[in-house]
Every structure is written in structure tokens, then in C-alpha cells.
Regions:
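Rossmann-fold NAD(P)-binding glycine/threonine-rich loop
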Residues: 3-10, 23-45
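Anion (oxyanion) recognition and catalysis
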Residues: 13, 41, 302
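Gly/Ser/Thr-rich loops at beta-strand to alpha-helix junctions
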Residues: 26-28, 51-59, 69
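Active-site Tyr-X1-5-Lys
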Residues: 32-39, 60-69
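C-terminal catalytic/substrate-binding lobe primarily of soluble NAD(P)-dependent oxidoreductases
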Residues: 44, 66-317
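Short beta-strand elements at the ligand-binding edges of bilobed clamshell
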Residues: 45-51
Length: 317
């Protein structure tokens, strides 16, 4: 999308056609809002990005959590778990190439400037934030090791919360996103690979090698062919939301009081890369939650096996 997506968005807006995509690149997504939001409003069309696995489960999960909190949500921690079958799993190299471009062009994106343009108003915040976590830590509730999730989910949710606050006058919730890895060894291996990968991307000769040999350079975590049909059929995902806030629904909420309520939401679905992503693509410039929250999206997602539900809070061990 960074290389070719703008031409499609521009053509859609100019010709009065709405546009839905499965992009996962925050800089591109937010620059499209900055450039085309007003024109889209004038034309009466919708530009809705990140409608694949990035970031329907997370964005709509946060919306589901807020709707079912029965109080005021102040922050949430989210955890994505990819469950593979006996055949293993390889992600498509397109995601890998996007990651290379994202890291390489990060300094030139001007993301801070873009965000000031599309979200000029400061949102109300409280001193109650999600716990500070180390880069690598063990989640004793989900029985997995956690690393920061580098996808678009956090930025998409932040924009949805801004829209919620500005348009619907709802208290904005903060979010921290993580990816779960089953073993400490593989979590450390993934962390080490990411560190080396980020350094290698900065130099043209190593970047060319990374781009040319995605399978070898990622230890076959990414392949040009993507997962096999059997791998996709065996794979599933879980997305967990641990919300914290207050029982009260007053506006403004009792921000000086310590949060007194917790709600847990779980989303389950099939293979994230293909089956869930195709199910997520549903029929100004919006996030998925801003565009779809008052529709029958949850029923639509359920028909593809992507189900949201509240679950009892789990105790730490």
C-alpha cells in the first residue's frame, strides 16, 4: 500500500466510490486520512483501512469491550495468539516486505506531523495507565511469553478512540498491544531476529539480501508462497482484551479514584493470514470501529468464525 495504494484511494474518492482495504501500515493509512478526508466527506464516500486481521479483531474487540464494560473503560491490554497445527505455519512474504519498507522509511514518514494534523485536539487522560512491561515478559494468566505487537493495531485503536471522543463524546480508552509466544526460547529468538532485522534494513546491501531471500532471512517464518492450504486450515487465533476502569458511567468519570472494575473479552477465529482476513473485509476516512460499530458487523464476523465474547477474569498464579 505504501508504494501503490494512494493511486487507488485517490481514484476512489475522485469518482465517488467508497474504498475498503486490508492495509497494515500506520504511516500510509494516516497520511491517506490527512490528504483525502475532506474530499471524501464532500463526495459522501468512506475510506476504511486496516479491515483485515490488522486491525478488525483488535479495533472491534476494543469497541466490544467498551460496549460490554457496563462502566467506563480507562485502559486495556491486548494479546494476540497465533495457534498453528502440526504442519507449522509460514506467513506470506508480502507482510515481510512491508515490514522492511516500514522500518526503512520510518524517519521520512513524518508520522508525528501527520498525527498532529488528523488529531489536533488533546484527549482527556488519567494517571491510571496500563502497567509498564519489559520488552520480554511472562503472562501468567495466558501462560505465554509476551513481546510488543509491532502491527498497526495500537495506532488504529488510538484513532478510533479519538473519533469516539470527538464525535460521540465518549471517554477515550488507552491501549497497549502484545503478541504471545508459547516458549521463552522462541520469544527470545524472535526478539533477537527483530533486533538484527532492524539493523540490517538500514544498509542497502543487507536490505537487498533481506528483500531477495525472505524465506532464508526469516528462517522460513515468511515465504513467497505463504502458508499451505493445510497450514491455513489447521491454524487459529485468539485475541484477548483485559480492560480496566470504573463501575461509574458518569461524564466525566471519577478519574481521581483508583479503577475498581475489570472485564475480559476474548476473540477467536480461524487462520489470521487468509481465512480471518477475508472474513474481515466487509462489504470522510475512518477506522473500522468508527465506520462499522453501529452495524451488524459482529454477526457478519461470526458467520466467518470470528467470535467475540466476555469471559470470567483469570487469576494470576
Amino acid at each position: 500500500y505504501r508504494l501503490y495504494g494512494e493511486a487507488v484511494v485517490k481514484a476512489a474518492v475522485e469518482n465517488g466510490s467508497s474504498h475498503v482495504d486490508i492495509s497494515g501500515e500506520p504511516a500510509w493509512i494516516e497520511s491517506m486520512q490527512m490528504k483525502y478526508s475532506e474530499q471524501a466527506k464532500e463526495k459522501g464516500v468512506f475510506i476504511v483501512s486496516a479491515c483485515g486481521w490488522d486491525s478488525i479483531p483488535c479495533d472491534m474487540g476494543m469497541e466490544f469491550l467498551k460496549k460490554n464494560f457496563d462502566g467506563t473503560l480507562t485502559y486495556a491490554e491486548t494479546f494476540a495468539k497465533i495457534n498453528t497445527g502440526e504442519s507449522g505455519y509460514s506467513f506470506n512474504a508480502g507482510t515481510y516486505q512491508t515490514l522492511i519498507l516500514g522500518i526503512w522509511k520510518a524517519k521520512d514518514d513524518g508520522l508525528g506531523r501527520i498525527r498532529k494534523a488528523i488529531m489536533p485536539e488533546k484527549l482527556e487522560k488519567t494517571r491510571w495507565r496500563a502497567p509498564k512491561r519489559s520488552t520480554f515478559w511472562y503472562n501468567d494468566k495466558l501462560k505465554c511469553y509476551c513481546l510488543p505487537f509491532l502491527g498497526a493495531d495500537k495506532s488504529i485503536v488510538q484513532r478510533s478512540q479519538y473519533f469516539d471522543a470527538q464525535m460521540d463524546k465518549k471517554f477515550p480508552a488507552m491501549i497497549e498491544t502484545y503478541i504471545c509466544v508459547k516458549s521463552g526460547f522462541w520469544a527470545l529468538a524472535l526478539l533477537a531476529w527483530l533486533m538484527i532485522f532492524q539493523i540490517a534494513v538500514k544498509f542497502s546491501w543487507t536490505r537487498n539480501i533481506l528483500q531477495k531471500y525472505p524465506d532464508i532471512c526469516s528462517a522460513y517464518m515468511f515465504k513467497n508462497s505463504g502458508p499451505t492450504r493445510q497450514q491455513a486450515e489447521e491454524a487459529t487465533f485468539e485475541y484477548w482484551f483485559f480492560g480496566t476502569g470504573w463501575n461509574e458511567t458518569t461524564i466525566p468519570p471519577p478519574v481521581e479514584e483508583q479503577p475498581n472494575k475489570k472485564v475480559v473479552v476474548r476473540c477467536d477465529g480461524p487462520d489470521a493470514g487468509y481465512i480471518a482476513t477475508s472474513g474481515c473485509v466487509l462489504s470522510g476516512v475512518f477506522t473500522s470501529a468508527a465506520a462499522f460499530k453501529n452495524t451488524k458487523i459482529y454477526d457478519r464476523l461470526a458467520s466467518f468464525g470470528i467470535v467475540f465474547r466476555t469471559v470470567p477474569e483469570m487469576a494470576s498464579t
